[in-house]
């Protein structure tokens, strides 16, 4: 890759490769979230035996496997980071793992048994997870000292592209599943992933390609400074993991709850899995609001650091999860509440996501030395993995042999709401004690 630029050009403007990365991310996120949006519905309604008969899962089992898959998606970034920073570089790692990703979608589209589900999700976990730290770190690599002031804004638009892809897919794939079955519903995301790979390949000559550090990368990770950095970050990420334990239940528990609600909203019948599209739509609306209005207004009165944003977001998450707790109480009493109440919960939870997730993404990149960017981004992804692993473990633990749950009804939501409240209070103390250092790429 000697014919590629290996350092950012001095420029106050937007790097030339950014549009290709954003376009790739939008298409890739369509494929991932479109597939993920229908997983619980597929496992509880469409899963087949090898003889073609129905072999659906109970709700607790489906939630357990769903969160185990999401956890795997966010554990595999460590593999991608090791390949990227230590051997192949970000660009080649993304291309290779994206092709594996496409094969996973193909497996889900053609085989609807538990074996096909396992193979498809395994390949997708390796591909989708492996490219995650590389893509987000690749964004930061395009910037130098003269345009680093645009980094925060571009990370916001990077997150915006994620949610544009997610919004469109979360409306489309549940409809495809309902009207055309799982073959087309899983096949369309596969086509979008292939398009995402091609878009990224087209931008190869516009990118800054930071060379892999090889053994230098390993030595830096295992050095005293590297281990101290990971130690500091691990404590922060442990608390953020609890946020993800709650947040990612929008794709499992919240979908199953929506099946028991009145689906008509403003005269439109909304499929239970489609209500998830509220989240990416709200993110696209709230990112500009927070970036250009809320944060500047608050900063004039109070210094709004990255960790303070995350702390506030955790308390907002407590409020957000209180709403489905109340909804479930109504359902337990025989009521059929409007799905509009879940929409309100999404407004509050998405506000928390903007404060926690986007800020943590930027925080992770700026805390990492040059040769550890992808590794630290992967380390951040571990917080999502740990959170989902916890939720999966809880669901498998509370599942009775007959498929029922030990934490039935509203008690399930009350448990997670209380857990988030305790976490938010303790995080205030941890954030006050954190001492870090900021790293930005040098220009040439």
Label every model-predicted segment.
Residues 37-63, 252-273:
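Short amphipathic helix-loop junctions that connect adjacent transmembrane helices
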Residues 36-37, 78-82, 163-179, 322-325, ...:
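A gly/Pro-rich, aromatic-decorated transmembrane alpha-helix motif that marks the paired
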Residues 76-100, 105-106:
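Conserved MFS/SLC helix-loop-helix module at the cytosolic interface between two early adjacent transmembrane helices
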Residues 1-21, 145-148, 152, 156, ...:
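Intracellular loop-helix junctions on the cytosolic face of multi-pass helical membrane proteins
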């Amino acid at each position: 890759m000697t014919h590629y630029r290996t350092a950012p050009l001095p420029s106050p403007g937007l790097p030339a490769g950014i549009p290709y990365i954003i376009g790739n991310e939008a298409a890739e996120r369509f494929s991932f979230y479109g597939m993920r949006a229908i997983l619980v519905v597929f496992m509880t309604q469409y899963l087949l035996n090898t003889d073609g008969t129905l072999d659906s899962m109970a709700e607790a089992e489906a939630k357990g496997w769903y969160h185990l898959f999401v956890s795997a998606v966010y554990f595999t970034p460590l593999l991608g980071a090791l390949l990227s920073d230590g051997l192949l570089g970000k660009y080649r790692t993304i291309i290779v793992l994206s092709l594996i990703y496409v094969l996973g979608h193909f497996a889900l589209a053609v085989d609807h048994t538990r074996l096909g589900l396992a193979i498809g999700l395994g390949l997708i976990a390796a591909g989708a997870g492996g490219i995650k730290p590389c893509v987000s770190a690749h964004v930061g690599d395009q910037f130098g000292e003269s345009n680093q002031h645009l980094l925060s804004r571009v990370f916001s638009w990077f997150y915006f592209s994620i949610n544009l892809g997610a919004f469109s897919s979360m409306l489309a794939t549940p409809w495809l599943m309902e009207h055309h079955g799982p073959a087309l519903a899983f096949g369309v995301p596969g086509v979008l992933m292939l398009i995402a790979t091609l878009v990224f390949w087209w931008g190869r000559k516009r990118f800054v390609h930071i060379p892999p550090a090889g053994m230098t990368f390993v030595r830096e990770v295992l050095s005293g400074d590297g281990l101290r950095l990971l130690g500091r970050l691990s404590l922060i990420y442990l608390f953020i993991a609890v946020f993800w334990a709650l947040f990612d239940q929008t794709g499992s528990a919240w979908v199953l709850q929506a099946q028991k609600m009145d689906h008509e909203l403003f005269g439109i019948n909304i499929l239970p899995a489609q209500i998830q599209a509220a989240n990416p739509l709200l993110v696209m609306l709230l990112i500009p609001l927070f970036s250009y209005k809320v944060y500047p207004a608050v900063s004039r009165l109070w210094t709004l650091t990255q960790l303070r944003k995350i702390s506030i977001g955790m308390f907002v998450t407590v409020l957000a999860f209180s709403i489905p707790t109340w909804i479930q109480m109504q359902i337990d009493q025989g009521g059929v509440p409007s799905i509009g109440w879940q929409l309100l919960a999404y407004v509050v939870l998405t506000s928390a996501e903007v404060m926690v997730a986007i800020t943590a993404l930027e925080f992770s990149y700026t805390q990492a030395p040059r040769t550890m960017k992808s590794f630290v981004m992967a380390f951040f992804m571990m917080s999502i993995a740990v959170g989902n692993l916890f939720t999966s473990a809880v669901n498998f633990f509370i599942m009775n042999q007959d498929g029922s749950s030990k934490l039935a009804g509203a008690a399930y939501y009350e448990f997670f709401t209380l857990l988030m409240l305790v976490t938010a209070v303790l995080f205030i103390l941890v954030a006050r004690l954190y001492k870090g250092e900021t790293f930005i790429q040098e220009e040439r």
